[in-house]
């Protein structure tokens, strides 16, 4: 039993010794690392610091470069703005000069237009005065032809003959519309047109004036005869149209001799 008790005691002592806490000095010695491990750690830390420092230096250099680039860009933009402003200013001056030139041209054009209009107005006034003077001369010639009858003016002769025909061959006083239309057609085709054609080239009315003295009375006689015949026809219970056709055919045969006499007279005296 004693040996067992001693062995038990030994184990108890060992357990007590093992269960006791370690002193701080011993723990520090245990925790101390070997020089190689420490140098390795320091080397790694130095490399990390070096990398950090290099990155920081690189960042500072990049920031400085960016600032310098920004300054140059700003200077370039300012310079470009100044150049652009100068160009704009020059452009404005140029535009102003062109504008002045255009205004000057416009004023010149207006002046030329005004002068042209004045010249045209003067020309038109001159033409108007010439026409008036010409018209006055023609009027004088016509007046002279009417008074003396010796002017060689075919136009004046034509107007005088037409006036005589209109005066001596009127049928406006005939009441029947059918008879009036029929006799008017006869006078137009048998008297007016042939006489006008006969005197178209004659210049002196005084030479042929005597050819128309009896024309008015001769035509009036034919018209009166046809009116009487028309009334007699209506008493026979014929229609107004039928009676007018009878007068139309009869008057044509009576007017032709009158026209032939006038044309013969004009032809003989007008030469």
From Swiss-Prot:
Entry's localization field: Secreted
Gene Ontology terms, MF aspect: IgE binding; toxin activity
Biased composition (Gly residues): 141-151
Highest taxon listed in the record's lineage: Eukaryota
Compositionally skewed regions (Acidic residues) per UniProt: 24-45, 53-126
Disulfide bridges in this chain: 211-265, 233-243
Tissue occurrence: Female salivary gland (at protein level).
GO cellular component terms, semicolon-separated: extracellular region
Keywords: Allergen, Blood coagulation cascade inhibiting toxin, Disulfide bond, Hemostasis impairing toxin, IgE-binding protein, Secreted, Signal, Toxin
Ranges where the record places region Disordered: 21-155
Span of the signal peptide: 1-19
A biological-process GO annotation: suppression of blood coagulation in another organism
Family recorded in the similarity comment: Belongs to the aegyptin family.
Record function comment: Anticoagulant protein that modulates blood feeding of female mosquitoes on vertebrate hosts.
Name the record gives this protein: Aegyptin-like protein
């Amino acid at each position: 039993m004693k040996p067992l008790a001693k062995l038990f005691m030994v184990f108890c002592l060992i357990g007590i010794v093992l269960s006791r806490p370690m002193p701080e000095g011993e723990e520090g010695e245990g925790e101390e690392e070997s020089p190689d491990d420490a140098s390795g750690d320091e080397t790694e830390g130095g490399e990390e610091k070096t990398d950090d420092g290099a990155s920081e230096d690189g960042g500072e250099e990049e920031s400085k470069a960016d600032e310098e680039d920004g300054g140059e860009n700003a200077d370039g933009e300012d310079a470009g703005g100044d150049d652009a402003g100068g160009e704009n200013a020059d452009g404005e001056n140029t535009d102003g000069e062109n504008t002045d030139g255009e205004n000057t041209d416009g004023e010149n054009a207006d002046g030329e237009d005004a002068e042209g209009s004045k010249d045209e107005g003067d020309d038109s006034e001159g033409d108007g005065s010439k026409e008036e003077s010409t018209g006055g001369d023609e009027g004088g010639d016509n007046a002279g032809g009417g008074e003396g009858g010796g002017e060689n003016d075919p136009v004046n002769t034509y107007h005088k003959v037409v006036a005589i025909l209109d005066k001596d061959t009127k049928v406006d006083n005939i009441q029947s519309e059918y008879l009036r239309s029929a006799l008017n057609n006869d006078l137009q085709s048998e008297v007016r047109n042939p006489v006008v054609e006969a005197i178209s080239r004659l210049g002196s009315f005084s030479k042929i004036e005597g050819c128309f003295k009896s024309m008015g009375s001769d035509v009036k006689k034919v018209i009166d005869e046809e009116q009487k015949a028309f009334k007699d026809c209506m008493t026979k219970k014929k229609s107004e149209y039928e009676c007018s056709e009878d007068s139309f055919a009869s008057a044509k045969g009576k007017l032709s001799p009158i026209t032939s006499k006038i044309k013969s007279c004009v032809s003989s005296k007008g030469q």
